[in-house]
A protein has these predicted regions:
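Conserved positions within compact, well-structured domain cores
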Residues: 1-161
Length: 161
């Protein structure tokens, strides 16, 4: 079995052991994505990247979040600028789309140092518990920081330097 086949099998059966990780784990001490692994940077160029856990926390704590039917308008309490974060749900191993348009999950570039199999996310949505990443919970106006398995198909909201 090739390494990629082995990894796919382990992911499919949720049998990844921390010892199977060779990057972003205890042995290499990395706590943030390298630029070479950042999909925003690879797709849109050097100025773009996935935001850190600290940047998501800043957004969550210093902005007004207004539900717009299929996502949030997030407005800065400091300068009034805003962005829109759609409730795009997330994708699982079989590529099924889950919880759209009630929830949104957004990756940060920061790993959960307590569990290297996971990274920090922001969760937004209508109801329920935060199991993955950064999540918003519209209707309850709930935005949470969560830790989720790195192989889940969550959205990204790139930022520029």
């Amino acid at each position: 079995m090739s390494e990629s086949e082995r990894y796919s099998f382990l992911i499919l059966h949720d049998e990844i052991d921390l010892a199977d990780l060779t990057k972003y784990c205890e042995s290499d001490g990395k706590t943030r994505l390298d630029y070479s692994d950042d999909v925003a940077r690879r797709k849109w160029g050097k100025k773009w990247r996935i935001p850190t856990d600290e940047e998501w926390t800043e957004l969550r704590e210093n902005c007004t979040w207004e539900w717009r039917g299929n996502g949030y308008k997030v407005s800065s309490n400091k300068n009034g600028k805003s962005i829109f974060l759609p409730a795009a749900g997330w994708r699982f191993l079989d590529w099924s789309r889950i919880n759209a348009p009630e929830h949104g999950w957004y990756w940060s570039s920061s790993l959960d140092t307590e569990n290297p199999k996971k990274a920090w996310q922001e969760s937004i949505g209508l109801e329920g518990e935060c199991h993955y990443a950064w999540v918003w919970l519209p209707g309850t106006e709930k935005v949470e920081r969560c830790s989720g398995d790195r192989y889940f198909g969550c959205s990204i909201r790139p930022v520029t330097e």
